[in-house]
């Protein structure tokens, strides 16, 4: 969500801001020129898994193990995701004002942590996070 802008409809799609729509056109041109591939918009990543506890529930004839969800998962939605030179780039377009707004700094830290975990698991720097600040 962008805080100090209004939604823009361009190219048959809705963007959160003019800046995001403009950046999409730059990325689309790069894809058309073969510089990047697999351009996607609004890709969701789970940054905090749901919190589940196991409870024993006593029924009339037996006791059953039940998984109870205490907290839902938290997600981060990236503005753009694409492949460039063998890397998966996760890109966020922000204004300076939005950078400081509400939960973005925390979500940025959590997505960076998630990317580091994915890269460590793979043993290579396959994922990269980029911020475009305008």
Language-model segments: what does each one mean?
Residues 1-134:
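Electrostatic, structured charged patches in enzyme active sites and in nucleic-acid/phosphate-binding
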């Amino acid at each position: 969500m962008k805080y100090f802008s209004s939604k823009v409809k361009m190219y048959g799609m809705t963007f959160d801001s003019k800046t995001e729509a403009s950046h999409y056109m730059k990325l689309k041109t790069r894809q058309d020129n073969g510089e990047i591939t697999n351009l996607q918009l609004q890709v969701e990543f789970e940054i905090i898994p749901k919190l589940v506890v196991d409870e024993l529930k006593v029924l009339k004839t037996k006791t059953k193990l039940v998984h109870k969800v205490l907290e839902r998962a938290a997600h981060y939605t990236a503005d753009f995701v694409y492949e460039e030179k063998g890397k998966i780039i996760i890109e966020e377009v922000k204004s300076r004002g939005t950078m400081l707004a509400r939960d973005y700094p925390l979500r940025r830290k959590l997505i960076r942590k998630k990317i580091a975990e994915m890269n460590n698991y793979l043993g290579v720097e396959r994922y990269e996070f980029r911020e475009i600040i305008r």
